[in-house]
């Protein structure tokens, strides 16, 4: 006759074994600061002996209606979180705030490789207590799905005019206006601007006037307007700006865009870029084609990522790590007033070695 199998240990049986309350056992796993070190150690040692792994997280979630995690929504492939330096720093900042406040972090990728149905299901199925939405367009369909969840939401960068939602970002227009003013002050009059995508449709080409009037990504629109304003202030026709859009955010995207810009206007003496990854790629392309930076071409970026700074790129540095940290804090520790908060973080113009007077 086989021996009677031992019943699985439960929170109740562990409490009975130790002659303590169920709350004491629960606190040993979930709120250790509520117990003395000796008592917690005794609870954990007995739990190990009886084979009790801890409170069921699913049951706890159902009971407390808390998932204990933050959802980070980004309209990019998952690999973008780790390959783009600015995005990587941002994610690290969110993770830092989650760790400090005892929360988990769930990455919710709704990039273009997913169908609308799959992306919607990912947002609806995310077991989280709130969302940080990173840099999506005005017309992003998943933003509406996030809002339908009726959970706390913090938007980062864009969209900039979402009513009733807290946002963390920078003054993109002012930062780009200062950078463009610096380039124009060096004497440049034939400017090219390499931008990240302006809309959800796939384009990798020169940007016409109609598209420039109606981009759905606020950050890119504001940076373009910043360049226009600097050109106007310097007495340069803004319509002379050569703009090339890159849909894909790949290590080669800036080089491809630089080629298009120079073919469209061989008189260009400066290539401004709305991201450092575009600028670094453009510099690689120029070097491969015998165009010296900055002697023959000025190149500027935006973000201030470590590789850009190490290569002496003239750029705008923004606090991506701090931006992520503040977004997480605002979500997990919202103001007592319950009112949305708009935080505009400082940027810094970095005068590197890639900008000089036109040849």
Curated annotation (Swiss-Prot):
Residues 11-30 bind DNA. The keyword Transcription regulation applies. This is HTH-type transcriptional regulator Rv3575c. InterPro entries: HTH_LacI (IPR000843), LacI/GalR-like_sensor (IPR046335), Lambda_DNA-bd_dom_sf (IPR010982), Peripla_BP_I (IPR028082). GO terms for biological process: regulation of DNA-templated transcription. It comes from Mycobacterium tuberculosis (strain ATCC 25618 / H37Rv). Overexpression of the gene in M.smegmatis impairs the utilization of cholesterol as the sole carbon source by M.smegmatis, activates the host's innate immune response and triggers cell apoptosis. The keyword DNA-binding applies. PANTHER family: LACI-RELATED TRANSCRIPTIONAL REPRESSOR, TRANSCRIPTIONAL REGULATORY PROTEIN. Pfam families: Peripla_BP_3 (PF13377). Signal peptide: none annotated. Keywords: DNA-binding, Repressor, Transcription, Transcription regulation.
């Amino acid at each position: 006759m086989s021996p009677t199998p031992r019943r699985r240990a439960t929170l109740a049986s562990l409490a009975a074994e130790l002659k303590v309350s169920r709350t004491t056992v629960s606190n040993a796993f979930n709120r250790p600061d509520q117990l003395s070190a000796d008592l917690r150690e005794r609870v954990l040692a007995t739990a190990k002996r009886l084979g009790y792994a801890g409170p069921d997280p699913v049951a706890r979630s159902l009971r407390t209606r808390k998932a204990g995690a933050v959802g980070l929504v980004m309209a990019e492939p998952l690999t973008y979180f780790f390959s783009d330096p600015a995005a990587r720093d941002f994610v690290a900042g969110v993770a830092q705030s989650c760790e400090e406040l005892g929360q988990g972090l769930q990455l919710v990728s709704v990039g273009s490789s997913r169908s609308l149905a799959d992306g919607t299901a990912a947002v609806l199925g995310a077991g989280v207590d709130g969302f940080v939405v990173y840099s999506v367009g005005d017309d992003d369909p998943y933003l509406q799905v996030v809002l339908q969840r009726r959970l706390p939401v913090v938007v980062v960068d864009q969209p900039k005019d979402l009513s009733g939602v807290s946002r963390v970002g920078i003054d993109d227009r002012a930062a780009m206006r200062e950078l463009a003013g610096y380039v124009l002050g060096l004497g440049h009059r034939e400017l090219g601007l390499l931008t990240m995508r302006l809309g959800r449709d796939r384009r990798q080409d020169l940007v016409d006037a109609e598209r420039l009037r109606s981009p759905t990504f606020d950050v890119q629109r504001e940076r373009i307007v910043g360049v226009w304003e600097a050109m106007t202030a310097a007495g340069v026709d803004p319509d002379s700006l050569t703009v090339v859009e890159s849909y894909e955010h790949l290590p080669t995207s800036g080089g491809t865009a630089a080629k298009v810009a120079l073919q469209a206007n061989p008189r260009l003496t400066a290539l401004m870029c709305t991201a450092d990854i575009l600028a670094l790629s453009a510099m690689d392309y120029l070097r491969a084609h015998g165009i010296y930076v900055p002697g023959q071409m000025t190149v500027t970026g935006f973000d201030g990522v470590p590789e850009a700074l190490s290569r002496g790129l003239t750029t705008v540095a923004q606090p991506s790590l701090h931006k992520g940290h503040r977004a997480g804090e605002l979500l997990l520790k919202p103001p007592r007033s319950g009112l949305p908060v708009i935080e505009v973080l400082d940027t810094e113009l970095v005068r590197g070695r890639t900008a000089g007077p036109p040849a």
